[in-house]
Amino acid sequence: MKKIVYTLLILTTVFMSCSKWTETEDNKDDFEKAALENLKEKRDAAKWIAEAERTEENKKALDAYWKMLSDYKEKAWLNTGEAGGQVPMNYFWFSGGFWTTQKGVAKTWLQSIPDSVVAISIWGGLGTRPEKISDYQKKDLEIFHKKGSKVLMCWQTPSVGLGLPTSKDGSLSGFDLFHQKYPYAECYAQWPEIYARELARYIISLNFDGYDVDWETCGDHGAVTKEGTPLMISDNNYENIGKFVKEMAKYFGPVGAGHLVTTQAEREANLKALFTASTSGFHPKEAEYIAEFTPYLPANYLTKRYYFCCDIPCTPYPPVFVTGNIEKYFDKHFLQNYNSETYTPSPGWTSPDMDRLGGKYYNSAGSNYQAGNFKVALTKAKAVKEGKVWGIAAYHGQTDYEITHENNEQFKKYLRDNNLKRKYLHYAFTREASRIMDPRPDYSGYVEKEPMIILP
C-alpha cells in the first residue's frame, strides 16, 4: 500500500522594523540592503506557505489512508462471510520482549508491521506497568491504532495472576502479588473472576485492545492442581475457566443480540463499575489496582471497542468455547494447526476442530514462524481465498521481518514454482499471504519501501 510521508514544518515570520524605512538618504546602502532583505523574506515566506499547504494536503491524504485502513480492518472482525462484508483476518502472536521501540531499529516498532495485519497479541505479556510505557511506545501505539490495528495480550492461561505487572516498588512479580493479595485458602472460589477483572484493568490502562485466551490441556504447565493451575480444573464441567471467560466478557468481546453483553450502555456500565472500588462483590484489595491504574485510562475507555479471542488447540473443549457458546463471548478463535496446509488439524491430530470452535467465519488458520515453517501460511492463504476459513495467524509473526524476496529458500522456491516476480524488503510471507487472500485490483503503482516510523 502506498505510504505518504509528510513533514511537519515550523513556520516563522520575520518582521522588519519600521525605522528602516525612515532612514535619511545618507543611509542609502542600508536602505537598499533592508529592501532586499524584505523581498527575500517575503519570497521565503511565500515558499514556506506553499510548503505548509502541501504538507496539509499530504496530512489529509495520510489521514484518509489511515481511515481507509481502519474501515477495512473493522470488517475483518465480522463473522458474516462475504455476504455481510467480512474480509480476511491477518493476526500475529507477537513476542512481548520484541516491542522495544529502539531508535533506528525499525523491526522493534509496531509501525513496521505490514498495514495488512489486523491485530497482534503481545505473546507472553509485557511485564511493564502503565506508568513505565515510554514516549516512543506511546507514539508507536498511537500510529498503530490510527492504522486500525489492534493490540491484545495473550499467554497460556492455566493459572491466576499470570501476566500482571510487578508491584509498584518492583519487589514482587505480578503473579506473587496476586497470590499475596488473594490467598488460596480464602479466595479460591473467587479467583477466576478477580483475575479477569485485574487483567482487564491492566490491559485497559495500557491502552491495549483486549485479550486472547490460550487454553491448552496439552500445554506445558505441568501437573494440574487447584492451587497451581486452577483454570485447568475440570470440576463442574470446567467451571473455573467458564467463570473467567464470563467475567472477562463483561468488559471485552462482542456486544449485541446473542452475546453476553447486549447493549453498548451495558458495556459502558460494566467498564465504569470495573474502575469503581465500591462496586458490589469486589474484593477490598481490588481497590489497589483501581487507584494505581485509573490515572492512565484512555479518554475513550468507556466507549472503546475491546476484543476477546481464544485459541483452544486440544480437547476436551470446555462449554464456553464450543460452537453455540463461543459466539456469545468471543470475537474470534485462532487455530493452532501449525503443520497443516489448510484449516484442518495438523497431521496425526484431531484437534483443533474448526467446526466445533465457532466455524469458518470465526477462525484463522495458524502457522508457526518461530519454528521456521513459513510456507504453510501461503497455502492457508489460498484456503482463505477459497472461503474455507476466514483468516491466517502467525506464531511469533515478528520473525518474518527479516525475510525478503531473495534471502529465504522457502520463499524463493515459492516464487520459482509459481513463476512469480515479487520484491519484498521485509515480511515477505505475511505480505504475500495478504496478497493471496484479498488481492488489490491493481499493483501497477506499487513501490517497495522501507517502513515509515513516526517518532514523538
Feature-to-residue mapping (PLM):
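Bacterial Sec-dependent N-terminal signal peptides
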Residues: M1-D26
